[in-house]
Amino acid sequence: MQFEIRDSRPIWQQLAQQLRERIVKGDYPPGSNFPTVRELASQAGVNPNTMQRAMGQLEADGLVITNRTAGRKVTEQQDVLAEIRRTLAMQRTEDYLKDLEALGLDRAAALELLGAKGEKENE
């Protein structure tokens, strides 16, 4: 899997964000073994310490559970996954609204466009 380091935020935060998204999308299913820090660091082309910091954030979020003898697993707690999914969706919605405001649309017009798109998809 590819990682993209694309903005000015610290690298570990970007890695944690991308791993969060992969977990809630199901790339790493609930209860599944999570790759090791070294494997992920190698995939991302970063120092293992940087990836460890990202993993620490995932553990703090409750998305990944560490078992000393069995490694890391993705949480099976659906409420945790649902809350992270909702948070990510809210962040993307806010980014979308900011992008449309940069084009000169106010929030009401942006939300109207979003609603119209949703209605068109449902037809």
In which residue ranges do the predicted regions lie?
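Extreme N-terminal segment that seeds HTH/winged-HTH DNA-binding domains in transcriptional regulators
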Residues: M1-N33, E39, T87-E123
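A short alpha-helical element within helix-turn-helix/winged-helix DNA-binding domains
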Residues: N33-A44, L58
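Short, Lys/Arg-rich nucleic-acid/phosphate-binding segment
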Residues: F34, L63-V74, Q78
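Active-site-proximal glycine-rich helix-loop-beta segment
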Residues: G45, M55, G62
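Terminal helix-turn-helix DNA-binding modules in bacterial transcription factors
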Residues: D79-E83
